[in-house]
Amino acid sequence: SLSYICDKPNNIQKSYARLMQHYKMSVHMDFMDGHFVPRLGVHPEAVDELDYAEHIDIHAMIACNNPAWEDILKTRADVIFAHYESFHSEQQCEDFLSRDARLKLAFKPYHTIQQIDTICDRLAVDEFLLMAYNPGIKVQDAYYNLETLADTQRHVTVDGGVKLSTVQQFKDEPKVTLVAGSKVLFNDNYEANIECLIS
């Protein structure tokens, strides 16, 4: 899944076209409000501008009562991840998830996979997004132990810190989607990264 905020829109589209013969492709859209996480993301209208993408997932790093949710839920996104930590109670979370079948949960890297699975069991959520890094903070040393993904049967989208070695590790794992950003693709070694990904 290509991270939309990591490059110019036309470069995202070109990368999508070059990789689509080799991977099940998606575009990953980050929405941030500057409060829930200390950065800003793209606007919801950008989702419906991606006419080439067969699958779009939204990672909403925003408060659960942000008015932007109305616009987000109007988009054509296939999956929309709302942060478990943004809700004041599980009842509020459950009520929110009932608004749209596309809504799933995202988690900051404070929870073990077992804890996430237990939460998803309680809330009847069949897939989740895992922030391998804390959201919105560029330079971090700690990284989630992705070996523990073997402990869940749910589909997991891994966002943050994905490297070429991570892609190789999970390339043949159908229940894991990796968000490809600046560490794996969109950097000064772009062409070499592409060649590595398609070889």
How would you describe each model-predicted region?
Residues 1-21, 144-150:
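Short, motif-level signal for alpha-helix interfacial/capping segments enriched in acidic residues
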Residues 123-130, 148-153, 178-180:
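Positively charged, amphipathic and often flexible ligand-engagement surfaces
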Residues 39-47, 118, 140-149:
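Charged helix-capping and loop-helix junction motifs
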Residues 3-8, 26-40, 53-93, 102-116, ...:
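Catalytic beta/alpha-barrel core
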Residues 84-88, 129-139, 173-194:
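Glycine-rich phosphate-binding active-site loops on the catalytic face of alpha/beta enzymes
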Residues 14-19, 64-75, 111-123, 158, ...:
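Catalytic cores of alpha/beta
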Residues 20, 47-51, 93-100, 146-153, ...:
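Surface-exposed amphipathic alpha-helices with a cationic face
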